[in-house]
Amino acid sequence: MFMINLLVVILSALVAMAFLTLTERKVLGYMQFRKGPNIVGPYGTLQPIADAMKLFTKEPLLPTSSTSTLYLIAPTLALSISLLLWTPLPMPYPLMNFNLGLLFILATSSLAVYSILWSGWASNSNYALIGALRAVAQTISYEVTLAIILLSVLLMSGSFNLQSLITTQEHSWLLFPSWPLAMMWFISTLAETNRAPFDLTEGESELVSGFNIEYAAGSFALFFMAEYMNIIMMNALTTTIFLAAPHNTAAPETYTINFMTKTLLLTTLFLWIRTAYPRFRYDQLMHLLWKNFLPLTLALCMWYISMPTLTSGIPPQT
């Protein structure tokens, strides 16, 4: 039974990722007053399948000066990590119910840095290496903020378990008491997934394509798939942490519909931000974190830590 559940989660994530690429191209198209993909299938709905066939049937090229082992392992590792992150997410029941689910997600997502670093170094290209170093610095920096925000949320829910987070939000979303944290979390997830306006790793005018410049065919597709699955996973996590729906045991499908709708809206917001905002300069990106987000998140974390002590003398309200 576990293997069937695992296959269902993997296939669902892959299908969602495939159609997210189509949605992005459609949204970008309409926002720029053009149609987007509309040739393959009705209204272009089969475009992701055509893209997959094209990429996976092309000849995989290995640069002669590259370190072949790491060069081939890096995209596989990126995709494996992005799939592994889905295991503790409650949809409405998780694949594996960890007591430390949030800690597992934070620790596993930080491993994605290695795939980027290995791909940049193993490609033996200056552009790829600079893109990889940028990505690593950016990801590690913003993980600090994500960890502190998660700690603040845990102080409100009292557990690392994602199911208990949903129980905490049975009557009210955690978005309301912690909206500054939610705003900083959302912006940090943009930076964590290397999306515009924080896509410094793929600065076309400077780095051609970034850390994946030497990749083609199937290996390039694996990086592409990992990036888009991380986007959906991060938005699913945002929904669970700040916008969780009450879990009705009599009709669990209502939770799934609610969860999917909110995740889809947040993902569409990711795409809208890409069309609306120009790319940040690298120093602005780092200043935003180290000079703005970090002091604010630390101050708010201290506030949430001190709240139980400050309110301990207040009698219970009946």
UniProtKB/Swiss-Prot annotation:
Reactions this protein catalyses: a ubiquinone + NADH + 5 H(+)(in) = a ubiquinol + NAD(+) + 4 H(+)(out)
Record's keyword annotation contains Iron: no
Subcellular location(s) per record: Mitochondrion inner membrane
UniProt GO molecular function: NADH dehydrogenase (ubiquinone) activity
UniProt key word Transport: yes
EC annotation from Swiss-Prot or TrEMBL: 7.1.1.2
The entry's keywords: Electron transport, Membrane, Mitochondrion, Mitochondrion inner membrane, NAD, Respiratory chain, Translocase, Transmembrane, Transmembrane helix, Transport, Ubiquinone
Subunit structure: Core subunit of respiratory chain NADH dehydrogenase (Complex I) which is composed of 45 different subunits.
HAMAP family in the record: NDH1_NuoH (MF_01350)
Protein name in UniProt: NADH-ubiquinone oxidoreductase chain 1
Organism: Saguinus oedipus
Lineage: Eukaryota, Metazoa, Chordata, Craniata, Vertebrata
